[in-house]
Amino acid sequence: MRCVILSACPVSPELKRLLRPDDFIIACDAGYRNCAPLGCKPNIILGDFDTAPCPVQQNDDIIVLPHVKDDTDTEYAARLASEKGFTEVLLLGALGGRRIEHTLSNLATGLGLEERGVRATLQDERSRITFVRSGE
């Protein structure tokens, strides 16, 4: 099974084609807003909810993170996906946006997943980023 992490950069409905029926979806903070255009429901919502209010949904697992922390919400979600044993992670809403440091951090998150043996892909409407490991 694959984990899809939805970060906060807005995504277009055309990315819905990337989703699979058995994907496990983690929405990070304002990334929850990306569920509507993608037509999906998250399995877990997590974040410090500094950029969007904590959604109130029945039957959703919600993990509230502290406001002061060393990792981004997306990094926390990636670590959670790795701990749950996913071998593939697709990050949507992780490229672009108003803050370049978030894009750079998300690239580092993808690399961190790869270093833990998890195949990572960051994708938006214009770009698809994967990582080539030594020996491939």
Where are these regions (language model features)?
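General beta-strand structural signal in soluble alpha/beta enzymes
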Residues: 6, 26-29, 47, 63-64, ...
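Internal, active-site/partner-interface "lid" segment
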Residues: 94-101, 128-133
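N-terminal beta-strand-loop-alpha-helix module at the start
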Residues: 1-55
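Short phosphate-binding loop-to-helix
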Residues: 62-84
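Class I SAM-dependent methyltransferase SAM-binding "motif I" and its flanking Rossmann-like core
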Residues: 111-136
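Short Gly/Thr/Asp-enriched flexible loops that form oxyanion-binding sites at enzyme active sites
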Residues: 100-111
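Short, well-ordered alpha-helix to beta-strand connector turns
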Residues: 22-23, 42, 59-60, 86, ...
